[in-house]
Amino acid sequence: MSFSAHTKDELARIEGLPSCCRLAELAALAKLNGRLVHGPAELLIVTENAAIARKVFKALKMQFRLAARVEIRRKPRLKKNNEYLVRIGNQDGLGPALEEMGLCTVSLRVRPGLKRDLVRRECCRRSYLRGAFLARGSVSSPRGSYHLEITVGDQRMAADLSGLMRKVGLEGRLSPRKRGWIVYLKDGEQVADALKLMGAHAALLDFENARVYKDMRNRVNRLVNCDTANLGKTVSAGVRQEEHIRLVVQRFGLETLSPPLRQVARLRLQYPEVSLRELGELAQPPLSKSCVNHRLRKLEQIAEHILASRTRN
């Protein structure tokens, strides 16, 4: 099961909501996954998740005392998945329920956008967001890129949902798609906040663990790359210094050098690959990095004079 499916499964099992929050969650599910059929009036809510279908069935009964029937169907193209259709037939109370959920007016005309009365409270905003995610949402595995999105049918609903996200501290962005719009979050902190707001605490824990692991892996990779680059610079500098010292020795002889320069020259000829700090630790008595660097620069200056004299001649 994917991370997105695990998250939905967890959210679908949240129970014990107060009436206002249950209404907000159910309204979002019906708004995004529902379809109103006329003559006689009938509401159809479709989902691929059995737990979501059970949630809708129970919420309709508890909130409005509406009778519903759940039908299981095979999807025509993807045979591996079932499709669950919650059918609410024409009955007393259906019209007022549709109006209360913001699906239509009293005269059963389709109502666009989000009904503001549903999300006046902070708790109801979170519940509506949870319902919208259960209906048409998805979240990427945190082992990849950070991305959470909710697909809606029109720009008005997308703008309303983005505005709802802003009220709970989320920066939902809009993007048009071939068959509608998406409201999405890209930042890792924003995705984590959304999971927390919706109540997906187990998914949030998995998300944060994966984020920590990925951040640590990236940090280690950066350090390794940095160490590799530094090692390359150290080796290149050591080889250059070795060549200069051999030039000086060939021209003047090692014994003609002063004891301090002779000591460092011998160490560098013996250990061309080590860093200045390590070279200083090999000396007896040990030398500081700056001291080793100063002596090697002296030797390189002598070598440069030799090369310059050759050029003039």
Swiss-Prot record:
Involved in cell division and chromosome segregation. Belongs to the WhiA family. The keyword Cell cycle applies. NCBIfam families: DNA_bind_WhiA. One of its GO terms (biological process) is cell division. This is Probable cell division protein WhiA. The keyword Protein biosynthesis does not apply. InterPro entries: Homing_endonucl, Sporu_reg_WhiA_N_dom, Sporulation_regulator_WhiA, Sporulation_regulator_WhiA_C, WhiA_LAGLIDADG_dom. It comes from Desulforudis audaxviator (strain MP104C). It comes from the Bacteria. Keywords: Cell cycle, Cell division, DNA-binding. Signal peptide: none annotated. Residues 275-308 bind DNA. One of its GO terms (molecular function) is DNA binding. HAMAP family: HTH_type_WhiA (MF_01420).
